[in-house]
Regions:
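N-terminal helicase ATP-binding lobe
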Residues: 2-425
């Protein structure tokens, strides 16, 4: 896809002090198309999709530099073929060194290849190209890992062994409900602590994308799944804006791999999948990564109205990518629930799971004691300190939390304490 960079017109752009002439456009991808006839006939169309748009859209590109734009508006072939009879020999030598069977290509043959690509691109319907997504993903992956690329390929698409989550316990009522229903998608409604995570993971059949709404919650889920699957071959990655910092103690490859295609389980927020909704740069690689996978949308009820709209659109696209979608929630407005159920294909396609009323009545996880005043809480704090327990005190005003922190600092000067509130920046 980059062999067109051999052209002197590209090479001169790399020289110090080079100034490009106004309106001059040379796209190395177009020059790469001159070598199409080296491929088998059945490979050509896929390779065109990989090459022709891996930097710019094929048609009506925002900069008007798409492959078809340039062909319509200027002598694109004439520009890119310059000195081809000279530089093509070097290009063929590189391709031969990479194992491709080559033969000399005349300017006439290069023109035939160019016109074949033009005709093919005009024949395409609107939509995304999985071949472009694969090329972009592979290109970025290899560029990031360099000589360590091959050693990491064996684990790139390992299907996770999720048998760990077959565990059962009476405290977790969802753990006793079977997950072998043949319907493709899942909607689970159950209280926090009922075993939704295990249930959703047991419903998965392939690689998993596990989404949660908040960075802190996906950090915790990443740690949990990584620990649960530590004795398997599963590759578990974390994807959010600060995820590289989260695994700063890991090896360099792990930090690099987070950003690229592959992994048995990826833990992320829906924002990381938003590129497939907006069609922003690189969305094809994300779509190629998601295609045919299991996607868990957990705690979906916590999103704002705007994010819920994006999530609904994400679900539509996931279905188009043949994903299995599993939704988990503690509570959800009935309108949103039925909207998602309809999107997923209704009861014929969705395994709906809700705990029976008698289970919910007995579902007591905690005992809450009401303290009449602050003075009585000191006994509770003293008892917790003596037992070595951690203590969380929650106030509904920043000023109140600051005053309480000062009091605790005076009462327990030797204990480690932390004050957290929204005015910290």
């Amino acid at each position: 896809h980059d062999i067109g960079k051999v052209s002197p017109l590209f090479q001169q752009q790399l020289k110090h002090g080079y100034l490009r002439a106004p309106n001059f456009v040379f796209r190395h991808e177009i020059a790469s198309l001159f070598f199409l006839s080296l491929l088998k006939e059945e490979e050509k169309d896929a390779v065109i999709e990989m090459i022709v748009a891996h930097h710019k859209s094929v048609y009506e590109d925002v900069s008007n530099k798409g492959f078809l734009d340039l062909d319509e508006n200027r002598d694109s072939f004439g520009i890119h073929i310059k000195d081809f009879s000279t530089w093509s020999a070097d290009a063929l030598g590189i391709l031969a060194g990479l194992g491709l069977e080559t033969h000399p290509i005349s300017i006439e043959e290069a023109h035939e290849n160019y016109e074949y690509a033009i005709d093919y691109c005009w024949s395409l319907e609107d939509g995304w190209s999985e071949w472009k997504g694969m090329l972009m993903a592979a290109d970025h992956y290899a560029s990031a890992l360099n000589e360590k690329t091959e050693v990491n390929l064996d684990n790139l698409f390992v299907k996770p062994d999720l048998s760990f989550y077959n565990r059962q316990h009476e405290l977790y009522p969802l753990s006793t409900i079977p997950t072998d229903d043949t319907r493709k998608h899942t909607m689970v409604t159950a209280p926090t602590g009922a075993g939704k995570t295990d249930f959703l993971l047991r419903r998965c059949r392939g690689r998993v994308f596990y989404t949660l709404p908040f960075q802190a919650s996906i950090n915790a889920m990443y740690d949990r799944i990584k620990d649960n699957l530590k004795n398997t071959k599963a590759q578990v990655y974390l994807l959010h804006a600060s995820s590289e910092l989260k695994v700063e103690d890991g090896v360099l490859e792990e930090r690099i791999l987070q950003r690229h295609i592959g992994a048995s389980v990826k833990v992320l927020t829906p924002h990381q999948m938003a590129s497939i909704v907006y069609g922003i740069k690189g969305y094809e690689a994300m779509a190629a990564d998601l295609q045919g996978c299991d996607v868990i949308l957990d705690e979906i009820h916590t999103y704002s109205g705007e994010i819920q709209s994006i999530v609904l659109r994400i679900i539509e696209i996931l279905l188009a990518l043949d994903c299995r979608v599993h939704v988990g929630t503690a509570t959800m407005p009935s309108v949103l629930y039925h909207q998602i159920l309809t999107l997923l294909g209704g009861q014929e396609q969705v395994y709906e799971v809700k705990l029976p009323d008698e289970t919910l009545r007995d579902f007591n996880r905690h005992i809450i004691y009401k303290i009449d005043d602050w003075e009585k809480s000191k006994e509770v704090i003293d008892d917790a300190i003596e037992k070595g327990n951690k203590i969380l005190l929650v106030c509904n005003q920043v000023k109140r939390s600051q005053n309480l922190y000062s009091q605790l600092s005076d009462l327990y000067p030797s204990l480690k304490k932390m004050l957290i509130h929204s005015r910290f920046k």
